[in-house]
Amino acid sequence: MDYFQKANDIYNTKDYNRAIALYKKAAEMKDNEAGSLYNSAVCFIHLKEYEKAIPLFHNAINLRPESKYFFNLAYCYAMCLNKPKALYYFNTAWTLNNEDEDCEKAINLLLKSYRIAP
């Protein structure tokens, strides 16, 4: 069975918990391991379970250090109110893809919040 593709199909129905279970099986079988870990983490973002997404993003990054992986990791840290780590990972994402306007906006928002904060 192609767990990764099945997980993608389930993800598209927004059944994120079932998709996570299938992505986990895909990752265990080394079936597009980085993509499986990344997509699992994105499912956790949809479920607003950012703390569960963070280690999955780190594991995916260890296998494939892509800009979008760092961007979503930074987003999770921002949602967990960890501004220093969010800024670090947004900057890393932007270093890998300096044409990403969303990343630039996120960095500017974080920097602005530092200037406003008491």
Regions found by a protein language model. Give the residues of each.
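Start-of-helix register in tetratricopeptide repeats
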Residues: 1-2, 35, 68-69, 102
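Canonical tetratricopeptide repeat
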Residues: 5, 39, 72, 106-109
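Register position in tetratricopeptide repeats
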Residues: 12-13, 46, 79-80, 109-116
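Conserved structural position within tetratricopeptide repeats
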Residues: 24-28, 45, 58-62, 94-95
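Short coil turns that delineate tetratricopeptide repeat
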Residues: 31, 64-65, 98
